[in-house]
């Protein structure tokens, strides 16, 4: 592409790209853990009903102090099917007859019970405070936790659609900075939320911003990097998500109060917002939208940072116009979602890309929900999960550049689907093997998302890239919403949801083969670049540009 020649002059992989990528990584390292924050801030600790004779100090000191806590619990709380104290009911009156261990009561009716009308007592050994303990989100109210999490997912879906279009209209930098500031404000205010509805509203606002911070960072660096280095830069940025997961596990273990943890993960975002002024806007986007003066400034700044000051000073608006004349002519009109779906070849690409993202997200969420039942130490599990996905992302960077985007996604998809299907035939006693296969699946989904992000950006033209990313994120959120709902099918067969998870991933691996390979190919700038698929014409165009540069 013509822009690649401009980028080669200012440096396609130099000090500027490294510094800006490092800044984006720090932002995402702090922002992404908010997606996992409710693993800790909304953790449900062990709990039981508040009991008058057990938890009222005045009553306990009036004769019942000679009885042990276990005995008082036995006469106050009924047992569930697992012979453990009920979490949501208590006896209306103490069952003193239970103190006679040898007594039998063949004619005694079942003791009357009642809900926890006086509240609950929580196990605070792991968490001193969560939103669950603060607002009593247990028993009949426990479903409200899922409501909060679902709202966060829906917010990400809406955010991708809304800000994806705005980003293509007004630029990557301004949307990145606005979302970073709003995310910092919503996260900080959520830490001091007085009620659960206010907390949910603030989390919803944060969800709208979160994915746009990540997608605009990836888009910006994809447009500032040469074709051979796009996969590397994208992988590094996405790897900061995994480092954030490890950070989240450590902080969750150290900080056991949910408000303090929420503040700790939100306050640094204000500092990052101040530094975000130094971020360079995508020169490629500026040129496509005919903002040549601004594009020239950004190109010169990049050249100066990369140590090519002399080259940067030789760049002129006339040279930029002559180099990217066709892209400027085709990029004059405003674009919308309909422009993304109107051209036939681009429409097919978007359909395949959306299906792959949708089908890959379903098993990812299915595995995440299932893995939570395997680990009793969620702090350690969070760290291990982050470490595994970090290693996988590093490994997939090598495979992408050696075997290509399509084969990498296909193999990763099979490594998700096959272990899920194999797990169906393993007994519950084979827990170690089941966890190992599930962890393999989680790692493979990480590989899919990393490769898919790179592949997606290389298949969509610059003028529509943010809109396409927003649409792609919408299908990802649809998959995330559908995944837990599929567990309802267990009433028909306990294996049915897992069959769907496994098959959907394998289908994604097959569909990705219908997309063109993009390894070492320049990014398309316009819709015509996609529709004409002009590889031969690109070579001719590059030769013409080389002649212009020589003459210049």
Swiss-Prot record:
Location of region: Disordered: 524-552
Basic and acidic residues composition-biased segments: 531-546
GO cellular component annotations of the record: plasma membrane
Membrane topology annotation: Multi-pass membrane protein
InterPro entries from the UniProt entry: MFS_dom, MFS_sugar_transport-like, MFS_trans_sf
Main localization, broad class: membrane
Keywords, in A-Z order: Cell membrane, Ion transport, Lipid metabolism, Lipid transport, Membrane, Steroid metabolism, Transmembrane, Transmembrane helix, Transport
Transmembrane segments: 16-36, 144-164, 178-198, 204-224, 235-255, 267-287, 350-370, 378-398, 407-427, 435-455, 469-489, 496-516
Subcellular location: Cell membrane
Keyword flag Protease: no
Domain of life: Eukaryota
One term of GO molecular function: transmembrane transporter activity
Key word tRNA processing present: no
Family assignment from sequence similarity: Belongs to the major facilitator (TC 2.A.1) superfamily. Organic cation transporter (TC 2.A.1.19) family.
Biological role: Renal transmembrane organic anion/dicarboxylate exchanger that participates in the reabsorption of conjugated steroids, as well as bile acids, driven by an outward gradient of dicarboxylates such as glutarate or succinate. Transports taurocholate, estrone 3-sulfate, and estradiol-17-glucuronide (17beta-estradiol 17-O-(beta-D-glucuronate)), but not androstanediol glucuronide (5alpha-androstane-3alpha,17beta-diol 3-O-(beta-D-glucuronate)).
Protein name as it appears in the record: Steroid transmembrane transporter SLC22A24
Native organism: Equus caballus
């Amino acid at each position: 592409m013509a822009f690649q020649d401009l980028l080669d002059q200012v440096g396609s992989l130099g000090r500027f790209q490294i510094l800006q990528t490092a800044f984006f990584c720090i932002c995402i390292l702090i922002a992404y853990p908010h997606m996992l924050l409710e693993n800790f801030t909304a953790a449900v600790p062990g709990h039981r009903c508040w009991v008058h004779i057990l938890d009222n100090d005045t009553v306990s000191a009036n004769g019942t102090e000679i009885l042990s806590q276990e005995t008082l619990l036995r006469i106050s709380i009924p047992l569930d099917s697992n012979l453990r104290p009920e979490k949501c009911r208590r006896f209306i009156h103490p069952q003193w007859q239970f103190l006679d261990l040898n007594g039998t009561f063949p004619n005694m009716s079942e003791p009357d019970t009642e809900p926890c009308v006086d509240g609950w007592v929580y196990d605070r050994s792991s968490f001193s405070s969560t939103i669950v303990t603060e607002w009593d989100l247990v028993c009949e109210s426990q479903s409200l936790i899922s409501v909060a999490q679902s709202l966060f997912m829906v917010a990400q879906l809406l955010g991708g659609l809304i800000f994806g279009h705005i980003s293509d209209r007004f630029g990557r930098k301004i949307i990145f900075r606005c979302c970073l500031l709003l995310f910092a404000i919503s996260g900080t205010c959520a830490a001091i939320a007085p009620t659960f509805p206010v907390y949910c509203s603030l989390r919803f606002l944060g969800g709208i911003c979160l994915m746009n911070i990540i997608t605009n960072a990836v888009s910006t660096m994809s447009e500032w990097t040469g074709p051979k280095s796009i996969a590397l830069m994208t992988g590094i940025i996405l790897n900061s998500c995994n480092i954030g997961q490890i950070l989240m596990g450590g902080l969750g273990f150290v900080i056991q109060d949910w408000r303090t943890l929420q503040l700790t993960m939100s306050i640094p975002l204000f500092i990052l917002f101040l530094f975000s002024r130094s971020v360079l806007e995508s020169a490629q986007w500026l040129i496509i939208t005919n903002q040549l003066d601004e594009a020239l400034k950004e190109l010169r700044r990049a050249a100066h940072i990369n140590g090519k000051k002399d080259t940067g000073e030789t760049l002129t608006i006339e040279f930029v116009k002559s180099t990217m004349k066709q892209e400027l002519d085709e990029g004059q009109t405003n674009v919308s979602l309909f422009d993304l779906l109107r051209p036939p070849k681009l429409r097919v690409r978007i359909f395949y890309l959306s299906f792959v993202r949708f089908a890959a997200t379903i098993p990812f969420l299915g595995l995440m929900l299932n893995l939570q039942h395997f680990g009793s130490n969620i702090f350690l599990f969070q760290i291990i999960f982050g470490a595994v996905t970090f290693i996988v992302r590093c490994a997939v960077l090598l495979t992408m550049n050696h075997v290509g985007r399509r084969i990498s996604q296909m193999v990763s998809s099979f490594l998700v689907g096959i272990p899920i299907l194999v797990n169906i035939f393993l007994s519950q006693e084979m827990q170690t093997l089941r966890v190992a296969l599930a962890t393999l699946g989680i790692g493979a989904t990480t590989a899919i998302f990393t490769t898919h992000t790179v592949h997606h950006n290389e298949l969509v033209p610059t003028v529509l890239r943010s809109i396409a990313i927003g649409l792609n994120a919408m299908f990802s959120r649809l998959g995330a919403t559908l995944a837990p709902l599929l567990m309802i099918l267990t009433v028909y067969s306990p294996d049915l949801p897992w069959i769907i998870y496994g098959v959907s991933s394998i289908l994604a691996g097959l569909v990705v083969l219908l997309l063109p390979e993009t390894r070492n190919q320049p990014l398309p700038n316009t819709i015509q670049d996609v529709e004409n698929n002009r590889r031969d014409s690109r070579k001719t165009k590059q030769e013409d540009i080389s002649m212009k540069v020589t003459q210049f």
